[in-house]
């Protein structure tokens, strides 16, 4: 793998901070653009690395990419666009106009700047929430019908459609499974992480939609999967969509609870057969394409994620895990 100059928008976030570390380990030059909405402590460890550069900027600004690039270094080869408002609760909290501004218009803005700079490829983080459940109950794949059931998913589809219509930098789209695991900026508003936190601190869990299936992926494996998009043959990769996860990561909520009970057997679990909130996903996803075309296989399991989360909480490595900064929607509306 040859050294590349890669721009990561949202690089101080949950996925971005681990992706930055992974890219630096691979020998790449990394420029992170982030407005530091959730703080910048996740980036501090990189500042002594000569291949790391940081710019505080908002991706909605017209020259945010152009003005963020370090001087006297080659132009970027790739932009990995992670920045935006992530998750249906956060998007609901700020409304459609703001969601479109940050998730659709900002994507267009960064892509247009990348095109003007002669960037070769543009990797985009989307979500598997865009799918409708299959009619036969089987797993959905990249060709399955789209049926967004949240404002967040709607905004991701709109951004995807824009990117796939462009002729500039080759867009490569990754529809991420639900992420879990520890990172420099951990989130506790995601299913596995939130379940473990509530089980550990409250010794009880209240579970809605117990039999609903979802697909899960460890945040470290997300970083690995995105990095595989850097070396896919350019013309073959252009406009491709990849579900990013693994078949082994398809779990029901009941199965996740069983993994938690294995490590916290004293907890009390209460089930309610209600459809609760705005996120009604009950879906199984196929990840054959990313395994076949990019060679991706997950290295960590949901059980690994539960283990590391319990350990981090028991040892006090995460102080005040109920702080709003660990939850996208709560922090944004403060």
Residue ranges and their predicted role:
Residues 203, 207-334:
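C-terminal substrate-binding subdomain of Rossmann-fold SDR/epimerase-dehydratase oxidoreductases
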Residues 1-170, 175:
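N-terminal Rossmann-like NAD(P)+-binding domain of SDR-like oxidoreductases, especially those catalyzing
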Residues 18, 94, 113, 134, ...:
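Generic structural signal for alpha-helix termini and adjacent loop/cap motifs
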Residues 136, 149, 161-214, 219-230, ...:
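NAD(P)-dependent short-chain dehydrogenase/reductase
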Residues 151, 155, 188, 253, ...:
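Conserved donor sugar-nucleotide recognition element shared by glycan-biosynthetic enzymes
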Residues 48, 57, 184-188, 249, ...:
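Residue-level signature of the cytosolic catalytic core of signaling kinases
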């Amino acid at each position: 793998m040859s050294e590349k100059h890669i721009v990561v928008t949202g690089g101080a976030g949950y996925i971005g901070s681990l992706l930055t570390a992974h890219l630096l380990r691979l020998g790449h030059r990394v420029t992170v653009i982030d407005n530091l909405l959730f703080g910048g402590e996740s980036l501090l460890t990189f500042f002594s690395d000569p291949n790391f550069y940081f710019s505080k900027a908002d991706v909605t600004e017209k020259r945010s990419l152009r003005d963020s690039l370090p001087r006297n270094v080659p132009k970027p080869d790739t932009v990995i666009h992670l920045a935006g408002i992530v998750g249906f609760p956060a998007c609901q909290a700020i409304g459609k106009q703001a969601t479109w501004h940050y998730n659709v218009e900002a994507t267009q803005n960064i892509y247009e700047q990348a095109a003007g700079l002669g960037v070769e490829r543009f990797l985009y983080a989307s979500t598997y929430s865009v799918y409708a459940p299959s009619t036969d109950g089987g797993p959905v794949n990249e060709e399955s019908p789209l049926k967004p059931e949240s404002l967040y998913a709607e905004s991701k589809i709109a951004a995807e459609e824009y990117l796939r219509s462009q002729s500039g930098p080759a867009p490569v789209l990754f529809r991420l499974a639900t992420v879990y695991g520890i990172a420099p900026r951990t989130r506790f508003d995601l299913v596995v992480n939130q379940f473990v936190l509530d089980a550990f601190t409250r010794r009880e869990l209240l579970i809605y939609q117990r039999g609903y299936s979802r697909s899960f992926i460890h945040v470290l494996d997300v970083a690995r999967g995105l990095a595989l998009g850097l070396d896919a043959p350019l013309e073959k990769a252009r406009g491709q969509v990849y579900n990013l996860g693994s078949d082994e990561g398809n779990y029901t909520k009941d199965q996740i609870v069983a993994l938690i009970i294995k490590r916290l057997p004293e907890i009390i679990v209460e089930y309610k057969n209600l459809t609760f909130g705005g996120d009604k996903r009950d879906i199984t996803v196929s990840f054959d394409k990313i395994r076949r075309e990019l060679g991706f296989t997950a290295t960590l399991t949901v059980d690994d994620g539960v283990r590391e989360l319990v350990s981090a909480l028991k040892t006090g490595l995460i102080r005040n895990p109920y702080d709003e900064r660990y939850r996208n929607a709560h922090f944004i509306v403060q």
